[in-house]
Every structure is written in C-alpha cells, then in structure tokens.
Amino acid sequence: VRVYVGNIREIRKVDAHAIDIVTQEPFVILPQTVSRWYIMSKAWCEKNNAVRPVDVRKGTENYASTHANGTGPFKLESRQPGVKTVFAVNPDWWGKAEHNLSQAVFTPIGNDATRVAALISGEMDLVDPVPLQDVPRIQKSPDLKIMQSPEMRTIFLGMDQKRDELLASNVKGKNPFKDRKVRQAVYQAIDIEAIRTRIMRGVATPAGLMVAPTVVGFVPELNKRLPFDPDGARKLLAEAGYPNGFEVGMNCPNDRYVNDAEICQAVASMLAKVGVKVNLTAEPKTQFFPKVLQRNVSFYLAGWTPVSQDSHNLLFAVISTPGEGAQGQFNGGSYSNAKVDELTRKIGAESDAAKRLAMITEAFKIHQDDIGHIPLHQQPITWGMRK
C-alpha cells in the first residue's frame, strides 16, 4: 500500500462528504492511485487494536490481517481459513450494487486438477486460474466457457546487483551480477520462445519492456528482446572471468504466477547449458515474498502489475533505488541508477504528456541498456466459468 500512499503528506477532513488530499510534491497520477486505497473505519481499527499498519516484510500481523472491516459491498458471513469464506450482501454499503448476487462463496482449491473438476462437476460456477493445459478440455464442454487475455502483469528475473558477494553462490569475494556482461549472458541464454510455446502453451506475450502495451508509457520501439544466443552467452561469461560458469541460488514462488515453478525450472535448465548452475528453491509465496522485500535473494523470478496503469508505478516501486518509504520497495536486487531515480521523480510530477512520455522512454532505455532486470513475458489471465 505504501506504493500508492507514500507521496501523501496529509489528508484533511473538509466536511462529512469531502476531504483535501495534500501530497509531498506534485503527483499527476494521484487520481489513478486513489482507487487502490482501502478505506477502513477508524473506530473499528481503534476498537480492535489495528490502527498501526503491520510490516509484512517482518511477518507481523494484527487483527485486520484475518478479520474484515466490512466497509465494502459485501460483509463477511463466515470464514474457515483455507477451507471456505462466505460473503453476504452488505445492506449498509454506501454505493450502488451492480449485481444480482445474494451471496458469494470463495473456496481455495490449491490442486489444479481438483479445481478444474469442481468446475466441470458444477460444484463451482467460476474458477481462477485455469491451468493452461486444461483450457481445451473446458472449451469443449457445452456448459462451460473460457475467458482469457494477457494481463498487465510482466514476469521478470531480478539479480542482486548491490552486495559485494552473493548470498548464494560459489563465487567468493565478488558478485558476478555486478558485471553487465554476466547479466547479458543470463538474458541471452534464455529461450523465451521455448518458454512461450512449451510452458505457457502459446498464450504468453514475450516482453522486451517491464510494462505491458496497455500501460501508459509503453514504448513499442523499446519492446524488443535481446536475441537468444547461448554461444554469445558463453563468450560473455568468459570475458567476465567465468569461462567455466558459476553457481547461484535462485528463489521462485510456486503458487503465485502462471506456471511460475515450471518457468524457473526451464530457466535453470537453459542457464546450465551455458555453464551457470542454478540451485533452485521453489517455495510458497508466503515464504518467497518476505525474502524479496528484505532483498535477501541472489537471483529470483517475480511479476509486477502497475495497477495505476501508468509506468511511474513500476519505475518507482520496482526499478528505483531502494530508499525512503515505498521507493524501490519491490526492487529485490537493488538495481540502482541515479539518472533513472531523477527521471522517476520528474515523471511523477510532470503534467505535460509529451514531456512525460519522453522521460519515461529515457528511463526505460537506461534500465534496458543496464539490463537492470530481465523481462520475460506478460502472462495470461484465464478464467473458467459456467455459461
């Protein structure tokens, strides 16, 4: 949430239905970010000792972590963690309902086969996600349909570029990822077409940029990947002083992104062919994300969706040098470029669309030339539902 409210200096009550929002500095995408603010009752928070936000990076929780405030269109009727959560329509909601539901039941089903079977049997009306390999089977059913499109989320690889020695590597006394040649070698060892066709069943969109085409600031001419070139990757590693490659630990979630663990396994296999041995740790997101947020990873796979639909969100949260508040909060590898930081600050305040786009383009070009991260693709979102 800090990513969306970190620039807010003060919120003043004007009257019962109006507030003034005061920012630290001009912030042109404030209207887009307001929709991501989750408003809670002050009285409820005070009553339940949940006024102070918790720090997910430290694994802390409070009452609000497991209980609903109930200010939305639905209210919590019952909850069995990991089993079932039942919502009923909130008759006191301040908005206008745009549905005909009386109840919504959410049932977490971690097993892909069981989830699909629940849809096919009629036990569930809608499931998300549908495993890509099951899409054709559902499409053949006369009672079911698939809704699928590319997400705004870009899946990427990050590398620790700050430590003098990686946390997980056989290289001692230096950090291979500080060398651009090594980062380029890793990039060019990855066969993105193989990942697209074999793992993503042809429905992922390969990415050369860290944002999707639907995001403000997307630059088509920069959306080009470095070519897959394993021979060139081996040459770059040798030039960087690693003719026999090296070992590195990789962290990857196995329950967050579409086929995340399978992608990481493929990346590990591809890097092995150029001499980089990847020791992969695929783990639940509850274990994975605290490590990324604390920047205790050497090499990792993650994804980002600029929910403001603006490139500034990604530049500020993922690419900027980690700093005060939410700046660089999701920059797990501590990539840092002073010029990118300067441009990001200006982009947040610039209201002239043409000037702003020029600065976004410059920032992305610098980051791309640095190989600050390695973009992979925009993953698909796939829902299965009853007709």
Give the positions of each predicted feature.
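Structural transition elements
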Residues: 74, 188, 205-239, 256-260
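Extracytoplasmic/peripheral linker and loop segments enriched in polar/acidic and small residues
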Residues: 180-188, 196-197, 273-290, 316-386
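Periplasmic binding protein-like
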Residues: 125-126, 143-146, 249-250, 263, ...
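Surface-exposed binding/hinge segments that line
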Residues: 2-52
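Periplasmic-binding protein-like
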Residues: 33, 134, 171-215, 259-263, ...
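Gly/Pro-rich hinge or "lid" segments in bacterial periplasmic/extracellular proteins
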Residues: 35-99, 103-105, 230-231, 235
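Acidic-aromatic pocket-rim loops
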Residues: 150-168, 173, 287-348
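Ligand-site clamp/hinge motif
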Residues: 62, 91-137, 180, 277-279
